[in-house]
Swiss-Prot record:
It comes from Lactobacillus johnsonii (strain CNCM I-12250 / La1 / NCC 533). This is Large ribosomal subunit protein bL27. Residues 15-36 are annotated as: Disordered. GO terms for cellular component: cytosolic large ribosomal subunit. PANTHER family: LARGE RIBOSOMAL SUBUNIT PROTEIN BL27M, RIBOSOMAL PROTEIN L27.
Length: 99
């Protein structure tokens, strides 16, 4: 019986199929952190800091969302401050506009 070249390649192939790995995936970053800098002007409702947990606490005129995001309750200037020895807070102080 005669075997043609194509069948010979099929018969004598020696590489096995590729297996799967347990690793090899990653999740995208969550874009957490400061969205406004100290001394920057901000409008009411703007996000100041995105975080998980209360790394930075809300100060004057700053609200906290359900996912611990800090946002401005009034328009003004952002100020990052120390709250005791080991805590930080962010406040928004209103600015009187020049007329």
């Amino acid at each position: 019986m005669m075997i043609n070249n194509l069948e010979a390649l099929k018969l004598f192939a020696h590489h096995k199929g590729g297996g799967s790995t347990a690793n090899g995936r990653n999740s995208a970053g969550r874009r957490l952190g400061a969205k406004r800098a100290d001394g920057q002007k901000i409008n009411a409702g703007s996000i100041i800091f995105r975080q998980r947990g209360t790394k930075i606490h809300p100060g004057k005129n700053v609200g906290i969302g359900g996912d611990d995001t800090l946002f401005a309750l009034t328009s003004g200037v952002v100020k990052f401050e120390r709250l005791g020895r080991d805590r930080k807070q962010v406040s928004v102080y209103p600015v009187e506009e020049a007329k």
